[in-house]
């Protein structure tokens, strides 16, 4: 959260190469599982859940795992949706990390494929613009359907601004 991604690219790449994950899907997915901002949003949401609610479940005989899945998860779907949207948009638009770890042309992300248009002679601006529009469609569709959760999640996570 405090350290920019560019500062940790080299150590992360060395880690991925030691695990022999370069040019594989885990190299894209695993580094993004526990991002600091996502943990911060979950922490702010979960600390505001009333203790009375959890105590009532405990008094009713609910185990901690059942309390989590029956009470905490349903009331926290807005923060889950918000984290999903923010992480999806960040990873969908990410260029530098996939550029480092995905070496094969068959496993390129959409941003790497768009960048490959710039290396051709002559530059086909119509193809570039069409690919950029196509790359934006999934984010627009997702935001239209999840806008309610996004706004509620930002409001309930404690981010002021």
Roles of regions detected by a PLM:
Residues 1-161:
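A hydrophobic, multi-pass inner-membrane permease signature
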């Amino acid at each position: 959260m405090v350290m920019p991604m560019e500062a940790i690219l080299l150590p992360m790449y060395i880690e991925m190469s030691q695990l022999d994950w370069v040019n594989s899907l885990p190299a894209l997915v695993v580094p993004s599982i526990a991002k600091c901002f996502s943990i911060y949003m979950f922490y702010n949401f979960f600390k505001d859940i009333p203790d009375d609610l959890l105590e009532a479940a405990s008094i009713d005989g609910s185990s901690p795992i059942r309390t989590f899945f029956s009470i905490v998860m349903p009331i926290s779907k807005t923060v889950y949706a918000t984290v999903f949207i923010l992480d999806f948009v960040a990873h969908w638009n990410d260029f530098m990390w996939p550029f480092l770890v995905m070496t094969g042309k068959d496993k390129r992300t959409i941003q790497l494929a768009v960048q490959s248009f710039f290396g051709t002679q002559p530059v086909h601006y119509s193809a570039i613009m069409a690919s950029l529009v196509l790359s934006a469609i999934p984010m627009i569709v997702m935001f239209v359907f999840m806008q309610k959760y996004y706004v509620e999640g930002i409001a309930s996570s404690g981010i002021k601004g």
